[in-house]
Amino acid sequence: MVFCIAPSLPLAAQGDAPRPRAAFRFSREAGQALGNLWQNSLAAREERAACLASSIRNDTVFVTAVAPLEPEDADSMGISATRSVEQCGPPQWSGTVHTHIALYTDELPSTRFSGQDRIAMRLWYDRWKSDGVFCLIYSARDAHCEADGIVGGMRGKAVGR
């Protein structure tokens, strides 16, 4: 299973040089687990979530493990932000991944994090006081991932959150 990743970091201020983007790579096992998460989400017709384990070297995030969460106590999309925040924290886990299956356009689900997703990401940071890695899967082969605190290969400190 190969995922095309569209990493995203804040745009540089006007006049600044563009910032390099972090790259994301997935182990074979993590890629297979993400594929299973997507297939299970489609079969259930509900979004699904999982914990992510990763390591960071230079400007690359290596996702090494994925552990699906059972879809209980969830919102209308099948995801419990509180549960994923509590179960997917350090030191074993470095963030979360979830699926977007509801169509946003005629052809695709949303390819970006929603406002609710951003709130869950903030809850994760507030709980663990650590930079996180977050992904969403929006097709059998595509995902969008973001990593807090990674700018041009340097691990940044969380400031002004």
Model-based region annotation:
Residues 1-8:
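Bacterial N-terminal signal peptides
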Residues 9-93, 101-161:
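Conserved beta-strand-loop surface patch within small alpha/beta domains used
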